[in-house]
């Protein structure tokens, strides 16, 4: 069975965005100059390349995620083009509450029950899957109990309040640590797996 990984940039207090300052607390807020050090970029690219399927919520996909990385993949010499090429090559599976037609290549949209569809995808042949998302989609995935690995890219900032992926939890979530690493740019990567 394929593994499902959730990768999120978070603050030290595990918020994914600030209610007041958006994402400017991140060392690299997914645009412009890629300010991570080379070792962290390699981790990021390697994790993405190890998957052949990306799960997204409709809001993130429609909000420009797929279009942005498709454009970056075409920019030869862009430091982010290796990551972008992996995004373009992977099959994107976009979840929506409403029936919608995909306007992107290599993408399927679905209104199927999230847990049922994720379990079906996990049982298909292929490499692992990775999910990126906004808070609503990530929280829904967490609540399915089907995430095998949590990859937290922890920025050295404490927000005090903000948007979390761990709201509306029905049960306590117990994880086991897999690895932890601090990178020269100040970001730590914490990887946990489901017990």
Language-model features, listed with the residues they occupy:
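Enzymes that bind and transform nitrogen-containing heteroaromatic metabolites
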Residues: 1-195
